[in-house]
């Protein structure tokens, strides 16, 4: 719930994204970490607006917001052309540390399941302070995200 007199802003679009390992080969350009913060919720991987890890164990994706924010929720758009079940069990962690690539930062939420192509908002139990937002998948599945929006409450313009 957005407090009265406030509006919500996605600060991820100004950040810098990276991931554990990028898919290689003919679809490498479609797989870049920055695709998930381009402001485009297109969920078809082949349209070039999603990210895709290579098939290594425990893949992660991270956005550096370039400054510290108080984060209320994270909105994720799941891949829509196939494989939507792969995201099940992914963790959303938020914090100020890069140790272990940020996967040990405090947990905002766990993605139980998402439909293929679904956009869903995950609310942190309380506002969280952090610079790094990490989506970590503790399996050997590929991690693909079509959009990640990091939501902060800002005072509304008068």
From Swiss-Prot:
* Entry keywords, A to Z: Calcium, Disulfide bond, Lectin, Metal-binding, Secreted
**Disulfide bridges in this chain:** 50-146, 82-83, 108-124
Organism listed in the record:
Anguilla anguilla
Q: What is this organism's lineage?
A: Eukaryota, Metazoa, Chordata, Craniata, Vertebrata
Q: State the oligomer form and interacting partners.
A: Homotrimer.
Q: Which GO terms describe its biological process?
A: regulation of cellular defense response; regulation of complement activation, lectin pathway; regulation of innate immune response
What's its job? Acts as a defensive agent. Recognizes blood group fucosylated oligosaccharides including A, B, H and Lewis B-type antigens. Does not recognize Lewis A antigen and has low affinity for monovalent haptens.
Principal subcellular localization: secreted
Family indicated by similarity: Belongs to the fucolectin family.
State the residue spans of region: F5/8 type C-like: 16-148
Signal sequence, start to end:
none
Question: In which residues is Ca(2+) bound?
Answer: 35, 38, 40, 49, 146-147
GO CC term, one of those recorded: extracellular region
GO function terms (MF aspect): calcium ion binding; carbohydrate binding; fucose binding
Q: Which residues bind alpha-L-fucose?
A: 52, 79, 86
- Keyword Metal-binding in the entry? The reply is yes
This chain belongs to which protein, by name?
Fucolectin
Further remark, if any? Binds 1 calcium ion per monomer.
Locations listed in the record:
Secreted
Chain positions of motif Cell attachment site: 79-81
